Amino acid sequence: MTNLNASQANHRNFILTGIPGTPDKNPWLAFPLGFLYTLTLLGNGTILAVIKVEPSLHEPTYYFLSILALTDVSLSMSTLPSMLSIYWFNAPQIVFDACIMQMFFIHVFGIVESGVLVSMAFDRFVAIRNPLHYVSILTHDVIRKTGIAVLTRAVCVVFPVPFLIKCLPFCHSNVLSHSYCLHQNMMRLACASTRINSLYGLIVVIFTLGLDVLLTLLSYVLTLKTVLGIVSRGERLKTLSTCLSHMSTVLLFYVPFMGAASMIHRFWEHLSPVVHMVMADIYLLLPPVLNPIVYSVKTKQI
């Protein structure tokens, strides 16, 4: 019990930083962030509304797209409000429990998005492999259970993280190097060994995001094998074009994450705080903004 309360006894709040070295420009950064937030809500809200009111879009593909849009909105609502409070209202403080809650939701919705992308990849495979039985295979019940399974997995793997953080003592700086709370940043402020936290975080990344990448690649290999079996070249290209939106979304989500992870691993000691901040922001902020644009441009039904 003493260890569990140690962090709260030492730090009752954290200080979230804006972009390092630009305190005078922080208010101006609120405008593009506010624009991104508004664009995210409008874009994903429009996707949800169009799918709801248009009967021709009541198909498995668009139900999965609705889940993706809801996830994007939830992820944005977990990050952007705290960023706006820093840049717009100059209110960088966040209480310890609120920081842990924000960290929990950011990681949960990040893993949910990864799981939804895997589901959408196999949705494309089923649609191409068994077009005549597509709707009968991916029924409403199957889609609902898939969504519940994706959310349950995310909650279960992230659930221990708040308790691991609460067991750490924070007796030095309480300044976080980001505009929102993340597990890796919070544990770096601890004045005790974080080996367990680091090991658990690595396990989560490998067995969630890593596994999801492999499953997505597998689905595309199976899809490509099916497409190559189509005799007509025109039909092959037409079939492949139905996967472009999903492929773009996958690249938007995984490439920034892998790029950031690679750079941090190789150049950790030489990277400036600004680079850390920008990489994290690209990974968390851009996909929710760009996903509805990608689907609107590349999906003529929407």
Curated annotation (Swiss-Prot):
Gene Ontology cellular component list: plasma membrane
Main subcellular location: membrane
Disulfide bonds: 99-191
Homology family: Belongs to the G-protein coupled receptor 1 family.
Functional summary from the UniProt entry: Odorant receptor.
Chain's gene name: OR51H1
UniProt-annotated location(s): Cell membrane
Membrane spanning residue stretches: 28-48, 57-77, 102-122, 142-162, 199-219, 240-260, 277-297
Glycosylation site list: 5
CDD domains, sorted: 7tmA_OR51-like
Sample GO molecular function, one term: olfactory receptor activity
Highest taxon above the source species: Eukaryota
Protein name stated in the entry: Olfactory receptor 51H1
Extracellular face residues: 1-27, 78-101, 163-198, 261-276
The keyword Protease is assigned to this record: no
UniProt keyword annotations, A-Z: Cell membrane, Disulfide bond, G-protein coupled receptor, Glycoprotein, Membrane, Olfaction, Receptor, Sensory transduction, Transducer, Transmembrane, Transmembrane helix
